[in-house]
Amino acid sequence: MINEELYKDLMALLVRVSNLRNTPQISKDTDVEYLKKDIVSVMTIVLRASREKAGTEDFSLGVDYSEALEYMDRCRIWISLLLETKAISKHIHFQLSRMADSIYCRLSDSSVQKTTLI
């Protein structure tokens, strides 16, 4: 199921971002916390979609993938800001951006599939 894969990839991104705290350039008051919150918001939406597909939640609530896309777009912006402020290296930026872009593309595909089913 695509939602399980998305959730795992989001978890991997969250872990990778959380591990940034171990670098000396990252302080507690940086954009990392905002980035983590946005990732968790996307995870919540993907989890809700999985539950609806499994029938454990009311399908009439619907899943708003556009909201998830907005959060992922913000994640991509936070990642770029971390590079601009030199909080992360270009190498780490590339890795995080690649992960975020992959998730964004799959969410975008899910959004298209969802709207065509309705």
Label the predicted regions.
Residues 1-118:
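Amphipathic alpha-helical assembly/interaction segments
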